[in-house]
Amino acid sequence: MKKKGGRKIVGFMVKEEKEENRGSVEFQVFSFTNKIRRLASHLELHKKDFSSERGLRILLGKRRRLLAYLAKKNRVRYKKLISQLNIREQ
């Protein structure tokens, strides 16, 4: 750790680059899909949890917009992602 102006600066360890790029559209859609599946199973047990239902709708909209973007930009990657995640086409 180094000190600069009385503050501590923590050096971060550089990890090897993973194959996944967390900023990529595919990773974001994958992440949203996992959250959607968790929320859907939660809502099966807790039918009156309306705040979680709203969160689910927001996530569905975000995923739908990302999938529309990917379909417009690169149809091959879109088809591959849809088949991997077992979700319907828009």
UniProtKB/Swiss-Prot annotation:
Signal peptide bounds: none
Disulfides per UniProt: none
CDD domains attached to this UniProt entry: Ribosomal_S15p_S13e (cd00353)
Gene label: rps15-A
InterPro entries named among the record's database cross-references: Ribosomal_uS15, Ribosomal_uS15_bac-type, uS15_NS1_RNA-bd_sf
A single MF term (Gene Ontology): structural constituent of ribosome
PROSITE patterns: RIBOSOMAL_S15
HAMAP family: Ribosomal_uS15_B
GO cellular component, one term: chloroplast
Location(s), subcellular: Plastid, Chloroplast
Family: Belongs to the universal ribosomal protein uS15 family.
PANTHER family, per the entry: RIBOSOMAL PROTEIN S15, BACTERIAL AND ORGANELLAR, SMALL RIBOSOMAL SUBUNIT PROTEIN US15M
GO biological process: translation
Alphabetized UniProt keyword annotations: Chloroplast, Plastid, Ribonucleoprotein, Ribosomal protein
The protein, known as: Small ribosomal subunit protein uS15c
Subunit structure, as described in the record: Part of the 30S ribosomal subunit.
